[in-house]
Amino acid sequence: MSTLEQKLTEMLTAPVEALGFELVGIEFIRGRTSTLRIYIDSEDGINVDDCADVSHQVSAVMDVEDPITVAYNLEVSSPGLDRPMFTAEHYQRFTGEEVALVLRMAVQNRRKWQGIIKAVDGEMITVTVEGKDEVFALSNIQKANLVPHF
């Protein structure tokens, strides 16, 4: 998670939770048209009205705090079936599930890994890949998503 994403998470967690939702994570994607993507969840699931409510709340906070200096589009959504993973708690919660990882720095000459989350120990996760346990530092994970099975 980038410094900006950490700052945004700290700034937006309380307003999102005040509406009764969990702030799952934040992604800021820089580009010609930058995007601030906010993932929310609740025990009852998420619908379009929930996303609109959070979008209005987040917009109000962002207008006051103004932490992003470039133009951007705001997207609020549920994590979906291919839920992104942002924290050690997410990996712990989904132990036993399949995850796809993209690493910042290669491990064994690979940046992309897919396997079953076996364990979480502090800032390290163990993933079983093709029958072998591999250990990754959370700080080295650039992107992680659950792999849905239909």
Swiss-Prot record:
GO cellular component: cytosol
Protein's GO biological process: ribosomal small subunit assembly; translation
Predominant subcellular localization, coarse grouping: cytoplasm
InterPro entries assigned to the protein according to its UniProt record, in alphabetical order: Ribosome_maturation_RimP, RimP_C, RimP_C_sf, RimP_N, RimP_N_sf
Keyword annotations of the record: Cytoplasm, Ribosome biogenesis
Alphabetized Pfam families for the sequence: DUF150_C (PF17384), RimP_N (PF02576)
Subcellular localization: Cytoplasm
Biological function: Required for maturation of 30S ribosomal subunits.
UniProt record similarity statement: Belongs to the RimP family.
Protein name from the UniProt record: Ribosome maturation factor RimP
Organism: Klebsiella pneumoniae subsp. pneumoniae (strain ATCC 700721 / MGH 78578)
Biological classification of the source: Bacteria, Pseudomonadati, Pseudomonadota, Gammaproteobacteria, Enterobacterales
Gene giving rise to this polypeptide: rimP
